[in-house]
Amino acid sequence: MNNTIISMKEKELRFLKFFHQQKYNVVDFNLIEELDWRRLTHEDLQQMDERSFWQQNKSIYALRNDFTDQLFRYYSNYPTHLKKVAYAGDIIRDNRVIKQVGIENYEPQFDNITQNFLDFQYFIQNVLHDDIQFVILGHYQLIDALLEKNHQTREVMEMIEERNLSGLIQKLTFNHPIIQILKENTLNQLKILSHYLPERHPAMVAIQSWAQWFTDHGITEIHLDVTAQAPRSYYKGIFIKCHLKNTTHSVLTGGYYHGSLEGFGLGLTL
């Protein structure tokens, strides 16, 4: 038990030290987030179903369940001059404490965020002694690009999320692009996608750019996910999920967001 605790703390510390050396600003935020009712958006209130929270006097408090969301709220209210930050700590999900390390980049141009990825990959290889086995790519504009608004009912969206092909065929017909893509192996879906989206569509450009970049850097097992639906309204672009070779519970996830704050985040569960 002692060795496990020490090993975990060492990983967090080495993460922060390494990213500090790479010119990231190390930040530390309280696990307990004090929320101001006057500043909570409708979306913030909807998230309360996912969080452990309580009210004391006239204040409401909640346990952190996502670093990106916490930093997004904070820096939206209190703008920062920081361009890229690194963090390590606990998040609470489904009543479980999970260790997470990650970064946020507030200048999310492609060259910047691919360098962020290379920094993370170096940490995975040289500190965790692991490597990326395969990548899942997606884009939060894909559903809107492939599915007509009148078909975006709760029932259909749930079927897409569940990959319920038989149900979708009844709702959309067999020849619908969503069904034609989903019936393919996820390794082949990127090729199929090009049949249904113009090559200059923003989602297509982003996915193709990342797929080519990964291939150029030796990561060739790339799956497409057309089913993902944005967990927050400000998630509007590419998202990435990287599974590691040696550990099934550690997943590197990231994505682009743009609301009151623009950025790109990458987080790894330890």
From Swiss-Prot:
<comment type="function">
    <text>Required for the first step of histidine biosynthesis. May allow the feedback regulation of ATP phosphoribosyltransferase activity by histidine.</text>
</comment>
<dbReference type="Pfam" id="PF13393">
    <property type="entry name" value="tRNA-synt_His"/>
</dbReference>
<keyword id="KW-0963">Cytoplasm</keyword>
<dbReference type="GO" id="GO:0140096">
    <property type="term" value="F:catalytic activity, acting on a protein"/>
</dbReference>
<protein>
    <recommendedName>
        <fullName>ATP phosphoribosyltransferase regulatory subunit</fullName>
    </recommendedName>
</protein>
<dbReference type="InterPro" id="IPR045864">
    <property type="entry name" value="aa-tRNA-synth_II/BPL/LPL"/>
</dbReference>
<dbReference type="InterPro" id="IPR041715">
    <property type="entry name" value="HisRS-like_core"/>
</dbReference>
<comment type="similarity">
    <text>Belongs to the class-II aminoacyl-tRNA synthetase family. HisZ subfamily.</text>
</comment>
<dbReference type="GO" id="GO:0016740">
    <property type="term" value="F:transferase activity"/>
</dbReference>
<dbReference type="GO" id="GO:0000105">
    <property type="term" value="P:L-histidine biosynthetic process"/>
</dbReference>
<keyword id="KW-0368">Histidine biosynthesis</keyword>
<keyword id="KW-0028">Amino-acid biosynthesis</keyword>
<comment type="pathway">
    <text>Amino-acid biosynthesis; L-histidine biosynthesis; L-histidine from 5-phospho-alpha-D-ribose 1-diphosphate: step 1/9.</text>
</comment>
<dbReference type="GO" id="GO:0005737">
    <property type="term" value="C:cytoplasm"/>
</dbReference>
<comment type="subunit">
    <text>Heteromultimer composed of HisG and HisZ subunits.</text>
</comment>
